[in-house]
Amino acid sequence: MHHLRHVVLAAALLLGFGSCQKSGSGSEGDYTKLTGEVFTTTFSIQYNAQKDYSEAVDSTFHAFSHSLNPFDSTSLISAINRNESQLMDSMLREVFLQSVVISRHTGGSYDVTCAPLINLWGFGFEKKKTDSVTPEAIDSVRAFVGFDKIHLDGMRMIKEDPRMKMDFSSISKGYCSDLVARMLKRRGVTSYLVELGGEIAFEGTNSRGENWVIGVDKPIADPAGVINDFQVRVQLPRAAGGLATSGNYRNFKVVNGKKIAHTIDPHTGYPIQTDVLSATIIAPTCMLADGLATACMTRTAADVPALIQNFPGVEYMLILGDEKTGFRTVMSPGFERLVLPD
């Protein structure tokens, strides 16, 4: 097994709420669709009830942001990062515990305490000038990175080093989709599709009584090297679950004329790129799918099956770089059975 490393993906969860917009489902059944913008991304929520739950959706977004949004200076995670508090709420605690499970099963290749390194490279919630990254700065930050340096005492989060900071962006967007799904289920909804910035929580069927079908981006490079997205159609299971995608083939910065990927390896402190360019995960929850998609970006394709075996009910699709064709796809047998023909 390759040496395992702590890594986290940077993602933007800027505080910025937009109101829900309701659209009816016409003659296709008693379904409601809510759309809008939140956290500088879009959301789309469909469910089998002719009731407007937009206020409950907005309340869920606000509660999530107050707990886990590192861009919100009033959030709990911001206060903990500034050492102004040690107190968590149930949401922050749940996400942290799930992140620790993934960290342990990956041998530390997934780690939410990598925030200072992510910030150093300009991908995190503290904007930095990436041309100022030096070996000395990287070494100093690496000294206080590590999920095993965080301890819980009830609802208190205790850091071994006060310089430690956490960023749950690599898992919390999926968790937010789960929170909306939970809210709908508490109100009697049995079929829903909650999509937040590409992270999806799902259950049941659509308004035609069929399994939900979604599109997953598959990059294709033309002869000139231009990347075009092709949609792989995936028929989701009827049982509750989540789908999430992480990838590097579009998210990068240019530093001194070089493309820098947004996955940082704190073992070295520098960006990492394996042969995995994108990972799509289907899992029992969207939070788990989100975190595992991130973790897959730190591994070679050959290492991913062993990682996924630790998590029952998880399937994957990987986009790999290929010198001849530009990209190629690798899927688990379970994922492949869900892909619809072109």
Where are these regions (language model features)?
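Mature catalytic core of soluble alpha/beta enzymes
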Residues: 2-6, 17-342
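Hydrophobic helical h-region of N-terminal Sec-dependent signal peptides
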Residues: 9-14
